[in-house]
């Protein structure tokens, strides 16, 4: 007589599959510690924790701790001392954690990061921003300009305004269209 339910044995332990899982996790951990910034990638120490690495570089691990927000404390106004009781408002103490960092290395890393940011900003400032609209939006802008000119209120009431753009949205879209390369191409043709 055959069984209706198949009997299952103990699941087999496959060393190869478990080793693959372990190696994959290990690779993912390594990927997390890598940074796109070359100076951070160069000074990163695999043996240290991320918090220790960042502290040694002189960078803030938690920006909220680095630049604390001033807490509004209620001042005691017109408080009259009672006999035998003194009122003392404690000042908050600064919490210092961790070991000393290498000051020269930290200064070097920070100066390199600042220099890299300046170079990126200069490169961005040199480039003109390119505006693009989708092909359908370009057609719509050309149609609206031909039909209504610069009257954004009329564009809003037009039956082809399927997305129900407001006059401000039309103004922005038309400005973007005029700054785009497609508009310049259409004007020259």
From Swiss-Prot:
Subcellular compartments: Nucleus, Nucleolus
Stretch list, region Disordered: 1-34
Domain of life: Eukaryota
Signal peptide range in chain numbering: none
The keyword Calcium appears for this protein: no
Keywords assigned by UniProt, alphabetized: Nucleus
Family label: Belongs to the NOP16 family.
Protein name in the entry: Nucleolar protein 16
Species name: Caenorhabditis elegans
Taxonomy of the source species: Eukaryota, Metazoa, Ecdysozoa, Nematoda, Chromadorea
